[in-house]
Curated annotation (Swiss-Prot):
Compartments, as annotated in UniProt: Membrane
GO cellular component: membrane
Domain (sHSP) ranges: 551-667
Location (main, coarse): membrane
Statement: the UniProt record of this protein carries the keyword Membrane: yes
Domain of life: Eukaryota
Any coiled-coil regions, as ranges: 18-82
Lineage summary: Eukaryota, Amoebozoa, Evosea, Eumycetozoa, Dictyostelia
Membrane topology (UniProt): Multi-pass membrane protein
Family: Belongs to the small heat shock protein (HSP20) family.
Compositional bias segments (type: Low complexity): 444-457
Name of the molecule in the record: Heat shock protein DDB_G0283913
Keyword Transmembrane found: yes
Length: 667
């Protein structure tokens, strides 16, 4: 009995233990399955999330590609290239030679010179055995047996550099954020051409404290001088413009007249090409509309439209349109939106046609031509420019220190920028941020800022406390606690201070567009004889006359004259003090339906009374600067001759500095 009970108890205990063991195993199995299920769910969720992220990454990549394409297309529309994505690895991105000309009278300053920058490729040639220090530029370009010179002229931001890039296949910086400096030369072995790019006219004048007239005259003279230099150095002149304006027409007329004079007087042949750049034209219909608007009508009265033909040139089964003026053979070409399908194809064909115009210069001595052109073209703008020389550049101590401290520093910050000639002033007061911070801390009432008459900018907040007129006697600590009053009624005091503070911080962060020079300074242009610089290279046209709304720059000596009728004679009485007959040239010309008396000459000043042959200061004399120096230099003007007077062989007499031309009445 006892044994049976014991067996039952043992069996029951074993059953309970087995059940517990099975239950635990089941729980473990369930837990394992639960973990596995959870892991499977997590894996599925992760795979789903990964797939979603991959889709998002793919979409982002597509968006980035689209943005890059838009960026490149936008850059092309702006005629400039942004970043490296649109420029081939072997693409030419810099000029070969840059002649930096801050101002035409820059050499009037002691120890100043124009700097010639060259690319790394040309710089390496300076150490070769063929390099000649006496003819440095000729040595660097000696490998080019023959080449044509092309100058690109035009107003600022009209597409000059864009044209050069298309012409040479280069990627030079262009557009509103890049400005060409001085005379920038690009050498193309493909076209056998040296192209000359310029900064363009109508650029803004920097702020100046005093002598505003002199700064304006200097700006005008420098732009004209650089334009004259480009014209004299080139055999092919390309004038780039957008929609034709009256200023463009006048400039084209001046170029045509100058080219015709050189051809007839000196047998110098130059070719003028006018390139009309239309960045908004996307089709041939739009181009023909532009031609009818800006070519046919404006040139109708001036260039005899019935003699002008639209020529058709077959090139690669495509047609290129261009105008040829029958009177002076000036060719007009057209460029369209390079981003459009039509413009891209049409521009390429137009450039191919323009490349066919060549005027080669064999064995051109660039050093001699450059120096001669510089001196001759300075004559209308400077008092008595002397001979110039080209020497190797010797960096100053400051430039060496700057190069050692920062190799990536822009050359523009190291080069002199017309030191005392052009001066800029700050946009905001240097302590404005500190003042605003003090206002935020004080939280008190803000007073109205008043702008001082000596302020360099209308936005420069020179603040004056209304409660104390004698602000100048306060300490610096008191001045830093000056208060602002809102200038805009829509802002509260705190909102205005916060807004102005953010504006000032943003102003400090942004940088203006700069034209940095990455090339290496290699040579300098300076006077051969370094004496009397201030007088020899002094600016002539430093006075301005306002006629209506136009500024007229007076340059050099301008003779006064009277027109007098005596009985049946007509007399032109002209004051020419200190001049002899051999100093004056005159002739009568028939232009259109009118006869003119054309008079030109040069007036030279004499300073040494003991030696009448001394034209400029001798070793015994020195010229002291004065505000009202006597006028000298070249002069030329024309006077109309009425039809009732005989226009040829006038009687001429010179007495006591007055020259008289007498014309007899016909009949």
């Amino acid at each position: 009995m006892f044994v049976g009970t014991l067996v039952i108890i043992i069996c029951t205990t074993l059953i309970i233990i087995i059940k517990k063991i099975l239950k635990r195993k089941k729980e473990k199995l369930n837990l394992k399955e639960s973990k596995k299920k959870k892991q499977d769910n997590e894996r599925k969720n992760f795979e789903g999330l990964l797939t979603k992220k991959r889709v998002e990454v793919g979409d982002l990549k597509k968006e980035i590609e689209k943005l890059n394409k838009d960026k490149i297309e936008l850059a092309k529309k702006l005629n400039c290239y942004i970043g490296d994505s649109s420029i081939p690895a072997n693409g030419i991105r810099e000029y070969d030679i840059i002649i930096d000309i801050p101002s035409v009278d820059y050499l009037s300053q002691s120890r100043k010179s124009w700097i010639i920058y060259v690319s790394n490729q040309l710089k390496q040639k300076m150490g070769s055995s063929n390099y000649n220090k006496k003819r440095p530029l000729h040595s660097l370009l000696k490998e080019y047996k023959k080449f044509s010179t092309l100058a690109c002229l035009g107003v600022l931001n009209k597409g000059k550099t864009f044209f050069i890039n298309k012409y040479n296949g280069t990627y030079l910086p262009s557009g509103t954020q890049a400005q060409t400096i001085g005379l920038s030369l690009s050498i193309s072995s493909l076209n056998e051409t040296i192209t000359i790019d310029t900064a363009g006219s109508n650029t803004a004048l920097q702020v100046c404290e005093d002598k505003t007239e002199e700064h304006l005259a200097r700006k005008e003279s420098t732009e004209m001088f650089i334009c004259d230099m480009s014209f004299s150095l080139a055999s092919i002149i390309v004038y780039v413009l957008n929609e034709l304006t009256w200023n463009d027409q006048r400039f084209i007329l001046a170029l045509q007249s100058k080219i015709q004079s050189l051809r007839s007087e000196s047998n110098i042949i130059k070719k003028l090409l006018v390139v009309h750049n239309y960045p908004k034209v996307n089709s041939q219909e739009e181009l023909l509309s532009e031609i009818k608007t800006y070519i046919e009508s404006p040139f109708n009265g001036n260039f005899h439209h019935h003699h002008v033909d639209i020529k058709k040139i077959e090139s690669k089964e495509e047609i290129v349109l261009f105008f040829v003026e029958s009177v002076n053979k000036t060719h007009h070409f057209f460029l369209c939106n390079d981003n459009s399908e039509f413009g891209k194809r049409y521009n390429q064909l137009t450039i191919e046609k323009i490349r066919t115009y060549k005027n080669y210069n064999d064995n051109l001595d660039l050093d001699k031509v450059l120096l001669t052109s510089l001196q001759n073209n300075m004559i209308p703008y400077c008092k008595s420019p002397k001979k110039l020389k080209i020497t190797e550049h010797e960096p100053t101590i400051n430039q060496i220190n700057n190069n050692n401290s920062s190799n990536n520093k822009s050359q523009l910050e190291e080069r002199p920028i017309a030191d005392s000639l052009f001066q800029t002033q700050s946009f905001l007061h240097p302590s404005i941020d500190d003042t605003i911070q003090d206002n935020d801390k004080s939280g008190s009432e803000v007073s109205t800022p008043t702008i001082s008459s000596s302020s360099s900018s209308p936005l420069q907040p020179i603040i004056k406390d209304e409660k104390d007129d004698n602000i100048e006697n306060k300490s610096d600590e008191a001045n830093t606690s000056l208060k602002y009053k809102p200038l805009f009624t829509s802002f509260g005091t705190d909102e205005y201070s916060k807004h102005l503070k953010e504006l000032c911080k943003l102003h400090q962060m942004v940088s203006p567009h700069r034209s940095s020079i990455k090339q290496i300074p290699a040579f300098t242009i300076s006077p051969e004889i370094d004496c009397n610089r201030e007088n020899d290279f002094k600016l002539i046209a430093n006075r301005i006359e306002i006629i209506g709304l136009n500024m007229v720059f007076s340059s050099g000596f301008k003779p006064f004259h009277d027109i007098v009728k005596v009985n049946s004679d007509l007399r032109y009485i002209i004051e020419v003090p200190q001049l002899e007959m051999e100093d004056i040239e005159f002739e009568t010309k028939h232009l259109g339906s009118q006869w003119y008396l054309n008079i030109k000459g040069i007036k030279k000043l004499r300073y040494d009374s003991n030696d009448q042959t001394t034209v400029y200061p001798s070793n015994l004399t020195s010229l002291c600067p004065s505000q009202n120096q006597r006028r000298d230099g070249l002069f030329e003007f024309s006077l109309p001759i009425p039809t009732e007077y005989l226009p040829i062989k006038p009687a001429v007499s010179l007495d006591k500095g007055v020259i008289t031309f007498k014309f007899e009445k016909i009949g």
